[in-house]
Amino acid sequence: VGLFNSLAISLISIYYEGKERDRLIGFENAAAAAATTIFTWLVGYLMSFGWHMTFGVYALGVIPLTMFGLFVSDKTPTVTGASTSTVSTQKPKLNATMIGYGIFMFILFVTYFGMTVKIAPLFEQAGYGTAAEASLISGISAATGFVAGVIFGSIKQILGRYMIGLGTLAGAVMVLVLSMSQNLILSGVAIAVYGLAFGMAVPAIYSAVAAKTDEASQNLGSTILLVAVNMGVFLSPYVFQLIASAFGDTSAVFSMRVDGLLVLALAVITLVTASLQKPERAPKPVHAK
């Protein structure tokens, strides 16, 4: 699965650019959100036939493999200009954009996973919901994440370089709202908006790295981001356990507030950085004399 994700984003970054690349990266995230929801339900159904049957979902990997062979060209994209003679000799290079956004994605997914696993305990400790209701409401974020992926390309054209910061800021506010919520309706709205904001920020990061990376390094860039994502998810429980132990508070509300403040710090740093960047200028038209 990790190889598929990295390759999919790399191919989009190599074969497409600009608005078309943004739109396809959004579609990739939308498809991932939809598949996560559908296959989670499918695995739950297959569990009734025994846990061995749950691994049957991996047989569906034949579908993208077949479609890839039928529809994706095996030809290297045409490169114009002076880079034509050098593209074949270029080697992957690590750049500051990859490192910076890799750290960003690590922290973001530490907080994302930390938030999702604390929803059920939060509902139960606050006394307004059950674990089953928390599971149902959590599914809303996947649905809004799908919507975010579909409309990502259009929103990216409006928000530009502020896309990542504003998406992260909206997510931070929603986590803090969730930590203070006392009813299912407000919690559902907060989770829905969080899914939408998260679904905007993540593809924007992939797009930003692709835009700042040469063709030979596209696969390296997407791989670094995906490794950061997986490490963030893996280490998230340990990070929040360490924080809870340090402050002597193991409640879900405390963890959720720490989560929100961490995401808020990411948002502030990102927005300040974006505001200091010079906007890209469109080339001036050449007038005939």
Q: Whereabouts are the PLM-identified features?
A:
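A late C-terminal transmembrane helix in Major Facilitator Superfamily
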Residues: 212-249
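C-terminal transmembrane helical hairpin of 12-TM major facilitator-type secondary transporters
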Residues: 160-205
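Extracytoplasmic gate region of multi-pass secondary transporters
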Residues: 97-139, 145
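Cytoplasmic helix-loop-helix junction between adjacent transmembrane helices
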Residues: 1-31
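Helix-to-loop junctions at the C-terminal end of transmembrane segments
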Residues: 148-160, 244
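Intracellular juxtamembrane helix-capping segments at the cytosolic ends
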Residues: 4-16, 200-214
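Symmetry-related core transmembrane helices of the 12-TM Major Facilitator Superfamily/SLC fold
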Residues: 54-70, 255-273
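Helix-loop-helix hairpin linking two adjacent transmembrane segments in secondary transporters
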Residues: 19, 27-73
